[in-house]
């Protein structure tokens, strides 16, 4: 492999890896026609937006009433601080922390630290062990390390415009775009409202706060379980989602606090930013 070919390969892998990392830390994503979520590597993930025909009938009764109160309260809060850990089989494990808002599309900033997996090893080879992700209503930005920047004309940021992601082949990009634009704490509640066997587990103490624990399972080819812990204001304190991927078990645990916190997310300097479509196109030139 020539030096130029190697450079092109590394850049292409890095662009896909950054997409996988940012998508993973926001939770299970959009689906293809079979109700599976697909990533840059083609691995199926439990879907938060499976076709309506594959879902169980909407939950009714006292449990549904309680969960809809949580959905409304969390949605109205508009923003929160987030801490999460995600493991996607042998492919990727990471930690994320920051603040996200959802009043007008997903906005905010997360610091993502790679803790293991083949994707993390790819990023480490590029001199990147952590990444800053900035979410804006029309796009998100991933900050790479200096070694990556040296390969792409000194630019550190990769820009992913959601409309451009939707144009990617195979439906995977549309799933990513939908996931990142619609990821909010109350999405986990919406999943429970369509679950087959929702149950109120009981009262528990979560990070020093009294909470009510709810649990449910979504069926289909890739079974997915969701657990949430809700405080006395009907706000999520903790969420755990579990499922399977082609590379192994998927588990995400997220904690939410400081609802209503002010969220800032600025666009990186244009001179320090490369569009992902341009990067991928240049690799084939």
From Swiss-Prot:
Annotated stretches, region: Disordered: 27-63
Lineage: Bacteria, Bacillati, Actinomycetota, Actinomycetes, Kitasatosporales
Lipid-anchored residues (N-palmitoyl cysteine): 21
Annotated Low complexity bias: 43-58
A GO cellular component entry from the record: plasma membrane
Name recorded for this polypeptide: Putative lipoprotein SCO4650
Statement: the UniProt record of this protein carries the keyword Membrane: yes
Subcellular location: Cell membrane
SUPFAM superfamilies, per database record: Prokaryotic lipoproteins and lipoprotein localization factors
Signal sequence, renumbered to the chain: 1-20
Residues lipid-modified (S-diacylglycerol cysteine): 21
Topological category with respect to the lipid bilayer: Lipid-anchor
Keywords of the record: Cell membrane, Lipoprotein, Membrane, Palmitate, Signal
């Amino acid at each position: 492999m020539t030096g130029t070919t190697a450079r092109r390969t590394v850049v292409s892998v890095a662009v896909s890896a950054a997409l996988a990392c940012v998508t993973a830390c926001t939770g299970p994503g959009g689906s293809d026609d079979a109700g599976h979520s697909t990533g840059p590597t083609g691995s199926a993930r439990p879907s938060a937006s499976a076709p309506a025909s594959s879902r169980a009938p909407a939950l009714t009764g006292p449990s549904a009433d309680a969960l809809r109160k949580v959905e409304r309260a969390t949605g109205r809060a508009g923003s929160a601080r987030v801490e999460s850990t995600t493991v996607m089989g042998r492919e990727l494990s990471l930690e994320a922390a920051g603040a996200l808002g959802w009043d007008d599309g997903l906005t905010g900033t997360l610091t993502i630290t790679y803790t293991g997996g083949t994707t993390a090893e790819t990023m480490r080879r590029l001199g990147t062990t952590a990444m800053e992700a900035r979410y804006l209503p029309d796009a998100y930005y991933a900050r790479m390390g200096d070694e990556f920047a040296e390969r792409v004309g000194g630019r550190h940021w990769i820009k992913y415009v959601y409309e451009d992601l939707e144009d990617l082949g195979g439906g995977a990009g549309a799933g990513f775009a939908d996931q990142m634009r619609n990821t909010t704490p109350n999405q986990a509640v919406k999943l429970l409202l369509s679950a087959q066997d929702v149950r109120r587990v009981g009262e528990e103490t979560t990070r020093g706060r009294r909470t009510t624990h709810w649990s449910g399972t979504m069926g289909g080819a890739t079974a997915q379980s969701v657990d949430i812990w809700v405080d006395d204001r009907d706000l999520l304190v903790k969420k755990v989602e579990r499922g399977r991927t082609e590379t192994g078990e998927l588990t995400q645990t997220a904690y939410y606090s400081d609802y209503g916190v002010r969220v800032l997310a600025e666009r990186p300097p244009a001179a320090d930013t490369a569009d992902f479509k341009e990067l991928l196109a240049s690799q084939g030139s």
